[in-house]
Amino acid sequence: METLLSFSAIAVGIIVGLASLGTAIGFAILGGKFLEGAARQPEMAPMLQVKMFIIAGLLDAVPMIGIVIALLFTFANPFVGQLAG
């Protein structure tokens, strides 16, 4: 039982850590490519900015899904019921 809970805690840490790391890398690439595009064609900067914010919103959804899965494993672990029964 304790092993299952400790592995769940490790899994939660990995899920949250990798989701945060992936999002940070994604935002860095997105910002860099936006600046490249805006520097190359300054007249396209407003349209690129709108698209960048849309993609940033979609990119931000990934760690939110990871946090929800981590909260599921933290507070309502589905594997504990199989162990008890």
Swiss-Prot record:
Q: Which InterPro entries match?
A: ATP_synth_csu_bac/chlpt (IPR005953), ATP_synth_F0_csu (IPR000454), ATP_synth_F0_csu_DDCD_BS (IPR020537), ATP_synth_F0_csu_sf (IPR038662), ATPase_proteolipid_c-like_dom (IPR002379), F/V-ATP_Csub_sf (IPR035921)
DNA damage in keyword set? no
The protein's topology relative to the membrane is: Multi-pass membrane protein
Task: Please give the CDD domains that the UniProt record associates with this protein.
Answer: ATP-synt_Fo_c_ATPE (cd18185)
Transmembrane segment boundaries: 10-30, 53-73
Q: Name one GO cellular component term.
A: plasma membrane
Instruction: Tell me the keywords, alphabetical order.
Output: ATP synthesis, Cell inner membrane, Cell membrane, CF(0), Hydrogen ion transport, Ion transport, Lipid-binding, Membrane, Transmembrane, Transmembrane helix, Transport
Q: Where in the cell is it found?
A: Cell inner membrane
Recorded GO molecular functions are: lipid binding; proton-transporting ATP synthase activity, rotational mechanism
Instruction: Write the protein's name.
Output: ATP synthase subunit c
Give the taxonomic lineage as stored in the record. Answer: Bacteria, Pseudomonadati, Pseudomonadota, Gammaproteobacteria, Vibrionales
